[in-house]
């Protein structure tokens, strides 16, 4: 929720949102449907619900407050899920995240946990050069607005109807296993895994 405020203040393109304080009981969202309900302090899409029908709002809110009393409600944008790794203030190639079913939730991120889902990653993303540059520009703007240094990863939605990029969130400590997304993007840019790790350590000193 703090990053959302930072994005809005800095003019970073990001979905419309409201932050609900449910410490004294559930507060119902005022955004028009469809929208996304998410606990702002969880990772890996835990507790995230895409809500399309009015009757599903209350159950989703009840589930969200089990993760904390602050709930982020965000306009739902139909489009491609992308992520941009950033190293030393420079954007790496865009990755297209392609869940095999539904959206990029826990089961699609970590299919071995429940033997379901799964996701394909296309890097560099299958985008026109101009579109990829727009996505990288939005990601860099978010990275700088949040005051991140050395490295990070920014999740972006590319709206289906007009190809406009919208920043969802920034990961200031992205996964760094050889199969994680930032190393995938770095490899596509010519950075072997060992060199990437050395560069991050060097920049951090």
Predicted regions, residues:
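Active-site nucleotide/adenylate-binding loops and adjacent lid/helix of ATP-dependent enzymes
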Residues: 1-80
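Glycine-rich phosphate/pyrophosphate-binding beta-alpha loops
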Residues: 45, 100-103, 171-185
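Phosphate-binding site of ATP-dependent enzymes
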Residues: 52-137, 165-166
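Conserved metal-phosphate-binding beta-hairpin within the catalytic cores
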Residues: 75, 86, 143-176, 186
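Peripheral (often C-terminal) accessory segments that flank ATP-dependent C-N-forming ligase machineries
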Residues: 120-125, 145, 149, 159-161, ...
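Amphipathic alpha-helical segments that line or abut small-molecule/effector binding pockets
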Residues: 133-140, 194-202
């Amino acid at each position: 929720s703090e990053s959302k405020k930072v994005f809005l203040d800095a003019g970073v393109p990001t979905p419309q949102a409201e932050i609900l304080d449910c410490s004294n009981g559930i507060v119902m969202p005022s955004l028009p449907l469809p929208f996304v309900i998410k606990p702002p302090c969880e990772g890996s899409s835990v507790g995230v619900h895409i809500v399309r029908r009015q009757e599903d709002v209350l159950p989703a809110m009840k589930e969200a407050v089990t993760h904390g009393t602050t709930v982020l409600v965000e306009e739902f944008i139909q489009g491609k899920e992308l992520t941009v790794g950033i190293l030393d203030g420079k954007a790496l190639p865009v990755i297209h995240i392609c869940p095999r079913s539904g959206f990029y939730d826990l089961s699609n991120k970590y299919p071995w946990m429940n033997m379901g889902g799964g996701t394909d990653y296309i890097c560099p993303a299958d985008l026109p050069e101009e579109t990829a540059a727009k996505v990288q520009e939005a990601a860099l703007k978010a990275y700088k607005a949040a005051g991140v240094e050395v490295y990070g990863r920014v999740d972006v939605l590319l709206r289906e109807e007009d190809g406009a990029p919208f920043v969802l969130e920034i990961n200031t400590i992205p996964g760094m296993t050889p199969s994680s997304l930032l190393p995938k993007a770095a490899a596509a840019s010519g950075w072997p895994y060992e060199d990437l790790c050395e560069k991050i350590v060097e920049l951090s000193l």
